[in-house]
């Protein structure tokens, strides 16, 4: 592995070299200019853009929701979502926030346990895509919002997540010691706020509050307990 965590340059099996790219210079990346991203521009775009330009968020809403439903129905991983659905109500309540949290946790349960369904990613991570998308879809359904409004809110959630990731630098955004569910949970909170009619100033404060709440969450590797971390991050996000 050279230069990047996903840049495999040498592979062998026994005495057989499958490929060797160690002598080749690393491909130079064209830097992406994120300076156009701001909270106000994100909100304006997602509110005014024609629906055909929001095809990706629309697909994310459908695909990630299907994965969450699979997680609620099957026995995947730690079954965080199913546990919250079946036994969380007496202690934690059974209202809006719990429904939003358990749906997202179920999606991560299913993904981390290898469910044969795709997840639409955010910033290269399926768990981040689930975390910033599924809660918004769940909230939109609970609030009985039309599908086009839910898609616009999903776009807000994903773009706000990307905005925060760009502030931590290219290397930190790609592989961070922090659990990036915190960033994505903030995006989800912004998407839900957008559904409620909150403006750009409010959404910026929401994101700042979320990051202040859960910024100390550390990544200890991708595995089943990611679902529990997503649940904790979303709990802090919904408080914001």
Show the residue positions of the predicted features.
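Acidic-glycine-rich active-site phosphate/pyrophosphate-binding loop
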Residues: 95-114, 147-168, 207-216
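Conserved structured core elements
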Residues: 58, 94, 98, 129-130, ...
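Signature of multi-pass transmembrane helix bundles
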Residues: 1-114
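Conserved phosphate/anionic-ligand binding catalytic regions in large, soluble enzymes, centered on
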Residues: 115-134, 179-183
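Inter-domain interface/hinge segments
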Residues: 122, 136-142, 148, 152-153
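Well-ordered alpha-helical segments within folded domains of soluble proteins
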Residues: 128-136, 184-191, 234-239
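Hydrophobic alpha-helical bundle architecture
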Residues: 139-147, 163-232
